[in-house]
């Protein structure tokens, strides 16, 4: 069960940075303005993209094939993300994200249902708009701090990972006004530090987010997003390279945002996996409420 818990945990890893799009891609806030958002996330999964070849249905299942969890397993995650960005200048923003997780995993080998809940790992961000023409280009850096409770217990999906991350992201954005269209592209590299408690380096990651949006009238925004993550293998006990912990996932996320007036908007999304490796498969539902505040 230890190995099973490891690959389930990686679902939670992406949740810490995935289900919400931090403020407006490459755009930065005007000086003195505050942008806030609270997002609810829910996922129930009984399938995953396998991490290693398996034998099933009379044949070998290749890495990345979508298969049911062993022993009728089912993973459920509920999360709430609170985040805020503040414009220090017209070009420089700082941001904060605080997640709350409630996660559990059950299968036919257990009489109980192991679960964990609580505040997860907090993230801090800074964004600097380098240029504005002919398109926006922004550099974003971030860190994930091990503030969540990491539990190395059989069957538990912990809310914290017990290690630091450092993100480096380049973002390009373009408005196509007078057409009511915009596009964003972000590509980042995540340096993942060792979890000293279990002597495990989870492996660095590349990640990306591509997004296009169109305004329908003055209040409705339709969006289409592609998101992905690719990781290196983990290194266990100082020198053992564990390729079964390589992670891959690609999401398609159609979403809509409805302006409620006064700088407030409601966003709804359905995030679906297209392919992966060592990752939960299926759909994720999100609902977010954002608000902006002037000086």
Regions found by a protein language model. Name each.
Residues 28, 35, 87, 93, ...:
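Membrane-spanning beta-strand positions in outer-membrane beta-barrel proteins
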Residues 49, 57-67, 202, 207, ...:
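Outer membrane beta-barrel transmembrane domains
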Residues 20-64, 71, 294-295:
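Outer-membrane beta-barrel biogenesis signature
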Residues 43, 89-91, 101, 131-135, ...:
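Outer-membrane beta-barrel channels and translocator barrels
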Residues 40-46, 98-104, 143-149, 174-176, ...:
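Transmembrane beta-strands of outer-membrane beta-barrel pores
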Residues 76-80, 113-122, 160-166, 200-206, ...:
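Residues that define the transmembrane beta-barrel architecture of outer-membrane proteins
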Residues 38, 82-86, 96, 124-128, ...:
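Residues on the lipid-exposed face of transmembrane beta-strands in outer-membrane beta-barrel proteins
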Residues 102-201:
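Outer-membrane pore/translocation modules
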């Amino acid at each position: 069960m230890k190995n099973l818990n490891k690959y389930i945990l990686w679902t939670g890893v992406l949740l810490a940075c995935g289900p919400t799009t931090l403020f407006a891609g490459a755009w930065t806030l005007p000086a003195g303005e505050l942008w806030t958002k609270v997002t609810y996330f829910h996922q129930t999964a009984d399938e995953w993209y396998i991490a290693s070849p398996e034998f099933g249905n009379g044949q070998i299942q290749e890495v990345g094939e979508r298969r049911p969890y062993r022993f009728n397993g089912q993973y459920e995650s509920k999360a709430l993300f609170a985040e805020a960005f503040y414009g220090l200048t017209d070009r420089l923003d700082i941001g904060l994200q605080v997640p709350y997780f409630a996660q559990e995993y059950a299968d036919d080998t257990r009489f109980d249902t192991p679960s964990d809940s609580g505040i997860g790992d907090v993230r801090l961000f800074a964004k600097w708009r380098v240029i504005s023409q002919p398109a926006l280009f922004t550099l974003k850096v971030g860190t994930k701090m091990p503030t969540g409770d990491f539990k190395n217990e059989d069957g538990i999906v912990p809310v914290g990972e017990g290690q630091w991350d450092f993100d480096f992201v380049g973002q390009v954005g373009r408005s196509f006004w007078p057409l009511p269209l915009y596009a964003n592209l972000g590509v980042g590299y995540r340096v993942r530090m060792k979890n000293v408690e279990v002597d495990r380096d989870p492996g660095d990651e590349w990640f990306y987010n591509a997004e296009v949006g169109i305004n329908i009238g003055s209040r409705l925004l339709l969006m289409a997003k592609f998101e992905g993550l690719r990781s290196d293998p983990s290194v266990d006990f100082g020198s053992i390279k564990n390729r079964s912990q390589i992670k891959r996932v690609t999401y398609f996320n159609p979403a809509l945002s409805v302006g409620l007036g006064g700088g407030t908007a409601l966003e709804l999304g359905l995030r679906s996996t297209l392919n992966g490796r060592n990752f939960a498969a299926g759909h994720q539902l999100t609902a977010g409420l954002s608000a902006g505040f002037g000086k």
